[in-house]
């Protein structure tokens, strides 16, 4: 699953190319007419929601792309925000695409990296236009189709279930060692790895980076939080900030499916 560094890499790439572009079209093969799964009801996997989503976003201009934990937030005109969670195998791609008539598949044009086999699972396509009406495409590739795409009024961000209970961002200057200890103290009997991956305790960390930072600081993943000495916790806090920052510089980890918006692999997996 893409974690903080991968989502940051994606957001940084999108922020360079999306603002100012207008959404002129939308396609998906995920929407179901009688969506029975409750967790998909307010996402594009529900046909009724998707049609409303489409109505609200087409014609709107993209203002800004940002991140909160593992969530990608795309602010658009009309005072709405698109929320995308990549889940297990999702990643966003940007470039030139066309829909093949014979197969109905969306295929990249020109960019070899976009033709990477891991980028072929296209299930959502935003058609975009710049001021000169030149078209580009924002594509969501997701092999396992677990990704989440929804929409909310921007002013209601503090009420959104996916966002309102998230813990602090570990790379913010305000995330001091004291704050780190205070967050762990909320789960004193929890196993440290489990607590690190709890998004309500600290935002953005998952399996890959919790393993890396625990290994570097010499802490057993099954250690109980309250029993870890401050000396070790300080090493863990330092490792957390160092490893996450390093992975962002390297473009994230592509041991599995993750690719950046150009369809390229990150390089963190080569350095650990």
Question: Where do the PLM segments sit?
Answer:
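Short histidine-centered catalytic/ligand-binding loop motif
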Residues: 110-115, 162-171, 223-230
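Acidic, proline/glycine-enriched N-terminal capping motif
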Residues: 1-157
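Short, mixed-charge, low-aromatic patches
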Residues: 5, 134-141, 165-172, 191-199
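Short capping/connector residues at structural and topological boundaries
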Residues: 12, 91-93, 97-99, 145, ...
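Basic, nucleic-acid-binding surfaces and adjacent catalytic neighborhoods in DNA/RNA-processing proteins
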Residues: 22-56, 66, 179-272
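Generic detection of long, well-ordered alpha-helical segments
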Residues: 1-4, 116, 170, 174, ...
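A short, charged helix-loop
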Residues: 144-186
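Flexible, active-site-adjacent loop/turn segments at secondary-structure boundaries
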Residues: 2, 63, 86, 90-92, ...
């Amino acid at each position: 699953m893409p974690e903080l560094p991968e989502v940051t890499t994606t957001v940084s790439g999108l922020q360079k190319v999306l603002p100012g572009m207008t959404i002129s079209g939308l396609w998906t093969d995920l929407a179901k007419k009688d969506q029975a799964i409750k967790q998909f009801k307010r996402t594009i996997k529900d046909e009724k929601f998707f049609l409303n989503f489409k109505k609200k976003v087409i014609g709107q201009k993209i203002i800004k792309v940002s991140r909160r934990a593992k969530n990608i937030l795309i602010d658009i005109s009309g005072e709405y925000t698109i929320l995308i969670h990549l889940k297990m195998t999702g990643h966003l791609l940007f470039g030139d695409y066309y829909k093949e008539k014979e197969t109905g598949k969306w295929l990249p044009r020109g960019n070899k990296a976009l033709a990477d086999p891991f980028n072929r699972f296209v299930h959502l396509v935003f058609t975009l236009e710049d001021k000169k009406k030149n078209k580009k495409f924002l594509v969501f590739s997701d092999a396992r189709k677990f990704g989440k795409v929804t929409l909310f009024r921007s002013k209601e961000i503090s009420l959104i279930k996916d966002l309102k209970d998230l813990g602090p961002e570990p790379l913010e200057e305000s995330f001091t060692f004291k704050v780190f200890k205070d967050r762990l103290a909320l789960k004193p009997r929890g196993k440290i790895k489990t607590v690190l991956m709890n998004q309500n305790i600290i935002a953005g960390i998952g399996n890959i980076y919790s393993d890396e930072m625990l290994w570097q600081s010499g802490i057993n993943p099954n250690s109980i939080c309250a029993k870890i000495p401050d000396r070790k916790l300080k090493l863990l806090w330092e490792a957390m900030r160092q490893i996450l920052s390093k992975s962002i510089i390297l473009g994230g980890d592509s041991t599995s499916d993750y690719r950046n918006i150009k369809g390229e692999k990150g390089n963190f997996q080569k350095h650990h």
